Amino acid sequence: MALLLLRMGVSVALLVAFFSSLIPSSEAYDPLDPNGNITIKWDVLQWTPDGYVAVVSLYNYQQYRHIQSPGWKLGWVWAKKEIIWAMNGGQATEQGDCSKFKSNIPHCCKKDPEIVDLLPGTPYNMQIANCCKGGVLNSWAQDPANAIASFQVSVGQAGTTNKTVRVPRNFTLKSPGPGYTCGSAKVVRPTKFFSQDGRRTTQAHMTWNVTCTYSQIVAQRSPTCCVSLSSFYNDTIVNCPTCSCGCQNNKPGSCVEGNSPYLASVVNTHNKDSLTPLVQCTSHMCPIRVHWHVKVNYKEYWRVKITVTNFNYRMNYSQWNLVTQHPSFDNLTTIFSFNYKSLNPYGVINDTAMLWGIKYYNDLLMTAGPDGNVQSELLFKKDPKSFTFEKGWAFPRRVYFNGDNCVMPPPDAYPWLPNASTRVMSSILLPFITIWTALTFLMVYA
């Protein structure tokens, strides 16, 4: 009876754990960037007769995930009947119903405003610091100076003291599609600001923070990249797994043949404002392919060539980045044509590298075609304790492109050393050979 109750208890616990895992959470976990998030900081700087003036800033603390054009969209729901009188450095996408105002019409009267960044070239009297980049928000490791965005908002019909102000709720962040989940606003210590000479400090009247984390599952996106492998010691080229990012279908326009005589007209007439990739017809149907080639074996070093190919006719990837995980990054000696930074997600273990293009040279990955690729070579020093070409050790454990996890080939498909098949066959035949030898011995000497 006790054993039955124990089994029932374990079953219930497993069911609870399973269903609780289905409940949406504001926390997401990326094993290569466990602390990555976008923090929204709301600083109330000035009280007004019917509200306040605040500066809202977005800090992208993600190491390698950035927001590309057409940029971020930040939304929330007002706690009471607040309105937005005016804005600098950003704008609400809709004004809403402001018909009750006879004069001095507000910038936005919606209960749930959605804010976007202003474009580069905006007049100076409409700008503030860290604004007007078209919603582009770079990653913290790649370009920390441009990993911040800000706008100023004048709020009316709101509280005018720390005790009467009500923080907004239900924050949303789009990039521009789904993927981010935001927690509740939390009042924190007021932000302090330092004068240019560093001799005076001022502070906000009130500050609250909102933390938003990204999940590829929440984004409901199919994979956007895949990995192919090859080596100097094996003629086999392991392609991306079939249907890595989708499968070809009979629907016209689902992909474009790279050698089609009508290629230019198809690409030019397609809706370029759409975020849906227009990809070249391949077996994997991914917009991006990362190829890892084990190129040369030296006495004390070994060399790898990485090629990133764009199969998307609809997008140039600006400020692209690549994250790869391999134990030999602790012994990386030289990298050509790319920038490099060690991420160290596990502290002392240096096995994760972030790679990105050199500004004005290859930081822009062009659309699909002859120029739609970037490449680099990496030189590693051999560690006698761990280095081997056996069993696919020389290939990466994980690969991310622009923060998205790429589809890897199955490990049993990796290029093996030429004598690997002989070793495997020998290990299989060894028991049979032993038995046959024993039987022969018995027959002869019995």
From Swiss-Prot:
* Topology of this chain in the membrane: Lipid-anchor; GPI-anchor
Q: Which residues are glycosylated?
A: N37, N162, N170, N209, N234, N316, N331, N350, N419
Q: Could you mention a single GO BP entry for this protein?
A: cellulose microfibril organization
Print the keywords alphabetically. Cell membrane, Glycoprotein, GPI-anchor, Lipoprotein, Membrane, Signal
Per UniProt, subcellular location reads as:
Cell membrane
Origin superkingdom? Eukaryota
* Positions of the propeptide removed during maturation: 421-446
Lipid tethering residues (GPI-anchor amidated alanine): A420
Which InterPro entries has this protein been placed in?
A: COB_C, COBRA_pln
**Gene Ontology CC, one term:** plasma membrane
Span of the signal peptide: 1-28
Which family is it part of? Belongs to the COBRA family.
The function of this protein is: Involved in determining the orientation of cell expansion, probably by playing an important role in cellulose deposition. May act by recruiting cellulose synthesizing complexes to discrete positions on the cell surface.
The protein in question is named COBRA-like protein 1
Q: Record the organism.
A: Oryza sativa subsp. japonica (Rice)
Its organism's taxonomic lineage begins at: Eukaryota, Viridiplantae, Streptophyta, Embryophyta, Tracheophyta
Q: Which gene encodes it?
A: BC1L6
